[in-house]
């Protein structure tokens, strides 16, 4: 049986290799993903550089705007790499057994077990099914995010951002680095971090500082990154700022961590070590099923609370709350 091999182009712009068995007149279509079709962009967030490879027709200007302030010109090997690809069907990827679908609201996080101790992940706007699938390498260094071909343009930014947050967290947690769910303001050369459950009013409290505490500006409104660097604890702006477009490539010393809770009054108190740990720990992102990551997280949190004051603010959403907080934490 004779066979020839040739290339064709799908309407999506994807190249396919096709084998045509001339005798049987059977054509087999096989997707080909060539590296030369991709362009890798590199970004540095909190001193950690990573790479993102996009196929022809997808640009960082269109799909990675929040990352533009973090463009890296370094020749260093990236800590990890993420490649964006399309698939005719996510089911064909066979990501594995569904273990759980997490989060109370979108984006929903899916976890699949492909074999014991090895996982694939998904992200979605609803709990019906994953909209994209992340297939990591065993060491999480060379990873691929797949989206359905018909929805590639619509899902690209969503898929890339969620995948990069997960991979960044996994790869940097052992490096004295914490990604934290918090809102952070900058004031007089230092940063003040506000923690709390979703809906507590972290962003609201930050906005009160912006309005009532002169010289204050927003550093990040959802996912800043803390690094312990020598004796210093610094906090960085990131491309991940939730619904607020605040993508500042800046670093400041972390002066205080304040956990908020709603109350009919404004009262602040400093926390002892054990309560400081309990205040910060739930706000940190971590692959908690991975023992190495969890151990590293605990050690970094301990370093942070030993060097940064932690507080609890019972508060109203008013100007007095900002003043009470500022007067307690910003005078140190």
Model-derived regions: residue spans:
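N-terminal amphipathic/basic-hydrophobic helices that include classical n-h-c signal peptides
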Residues: 1-36
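A noncatalytic interaction/capping subdomain that flanks phosphate/NTP-handling catalytic cores
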Residues: 33-193, 198, 208-217, 225-332
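Conserved glycine(s) of the Walker
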Residues: 201
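Hydrophobic positions on the alpha1 helix immediately C-terminal to the Walker A/P-loop
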Residues: 205
């Amino acid at each position: 049986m004779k066979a020839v091999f040739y290339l064709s182009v799908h309407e999506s712009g994807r190249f396919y290799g096709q084998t045509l068995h001339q005798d049987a007149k059977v054509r087999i279509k096989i997707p080909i993903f060539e590296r030369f079709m991709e362009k890798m962009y590199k970004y540095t967030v909190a001193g950690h550089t990573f790479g993102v490879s996009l196929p022809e027709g997808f640009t960082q200007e269109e799909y990675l705007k929040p990352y533009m302030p973090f463009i890296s010109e370094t020749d260093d090997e990236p800590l990890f790499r993420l490649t964006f690809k399309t698939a005719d069907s996510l089911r064909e990827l066979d990501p594995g057994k569904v273990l759980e679908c997490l989060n109370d609201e979108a984006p929903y996080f899916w976890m699949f077990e492909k074999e014991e101790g090895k996982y694939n992940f998904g992200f979605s706007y609803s709990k019906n099914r994953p909209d994209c699938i992340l297939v990591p390498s065993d060491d999480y260094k060379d990873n691929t995010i797949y989206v359905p071909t018909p929805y590639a343009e619509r899902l690209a930014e969503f898929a890339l951002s969620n995948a990069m947050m997960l991979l960044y967290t996994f790869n940097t947690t052992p490096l004295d680095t914490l990604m934290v769910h918090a809102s952070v303001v900058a004031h007089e050369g230092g940063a003040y971090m506000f923690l709390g459950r979703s809906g507590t009013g972290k962003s609201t409290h930050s906005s009160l500082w912006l309005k009532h505490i002169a010289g204050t500006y927003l550093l990040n409104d959802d996912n800043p990154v803390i690094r312990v660097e020598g004796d210093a604890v610094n906090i960085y702006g990131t491309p991940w700022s939730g619904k607020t477009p605040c993508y500042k490539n800046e670093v400041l010393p972390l002066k205080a961590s304040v956990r908020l809770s709603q109350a009919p009054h404004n009262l602040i108190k400093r926390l002892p070590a054990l309560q400081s740990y309990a205040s910060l720990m739930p706000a940190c992102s971590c692959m908690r099923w991975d023992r190495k990551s969890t151990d590293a997280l605990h050690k970094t949190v301990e370093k942070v609370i030993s060097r940064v004051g932690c507080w609890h603010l019972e508060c109203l959403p008013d100007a007095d709350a900002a003043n009470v907080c500022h007067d307690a934490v910003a005078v140190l």
